[in-house]
Amino acid sequence: MLSADYIVGLTDGEGSFTAYIRPPQAKHGAKNYRVECHYYIKLRDDNVALLKKVKQFFGIGRLSFQRDRRPHHHSCFRYEVTNLEQIARVIIPFFQRYPLQGDKIRDFVLLNKIVRAVLKKKHQTRTGLTEIQRWKAEMHQYADSPNTGNPFVRPRQGKSRAR
């Protein structure tokens, strides 16, 4: 069994917290925007056994295969949790108890805000949706990204890391 610290480190390095905002689908009678929240860890296909252990650790989520045909890229597996209630009940409390140490803590904090807003149905109001869109826009803006308006971003000290 994996440790909580290992899960935190793996998420800091290979994981993501994100949200998607989908417009209403009139053909299905929907009037409101849909907000989808995601937590995932993506690893090369030769590490699928590790992702199975992550799935076992949390007891929720699913594994999926992603084929990549680009030169110099590997196909991968993805462990993902997209069920809002499971994210609220399992993923958020876990990372509150065992905090992330890297830049992704900002994405986690923003996802937590989005999840709470969606559970309260705030995405069904114009002001609530606008607030969620603002939080979504702040996600994935790290100190070495070309972003100037993100209040979470602090300039890095010393040498910047090579990518």
Residue ranges: model-predicted function:
Residues 1-163:
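Sequence-level preference for short, compositionally simple segments enriched
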